[in-house]
Amino acid sequence: MVDYLPRSAWRARAATNAASLVRSEVLNLAFHWPGMSKPINAVGDAGKARVASALRGWQAYHMDGRGWSDIAYQVAIDQEGRAWTLRGINIRSGANGDATVNRKYGAVLLVLGPGEKPSAKMTATAKAVVADYRKRFTRIPV
């Protein structure tokens, strides 16, 4: 099981609405990456602060710019392998297109910049996050 950083770790704003996922409806999850102009150095406490700042920026864009209820993704994973609670695994994503798809698929944000490949730490955490999804949503294939 992954040790998820709470929303307070990135000083998230409160969501304006949250719909829970129905366990029997979830079929799988999708990995997304942000449209960043350059990679974020996630190393150490300063790196953690940079990732937290980026998450707040994406949340502001989604809520203020797009009119959504919260940041679109359920979880984020940075290059240091930290897993960040965004909406949370049990809350419906807003990142996969329309409402039907968001009811059936989770959404995980990989904090990657242009040309950046996932680190071994990110990959290990991503695999563990997938395992957590599979424990909660048993229709997700192995």
PLM ranges: what are they?
Residues M1-P141:
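Active-site-adjacent loop/helix surface patches within enzyme catalytic domains
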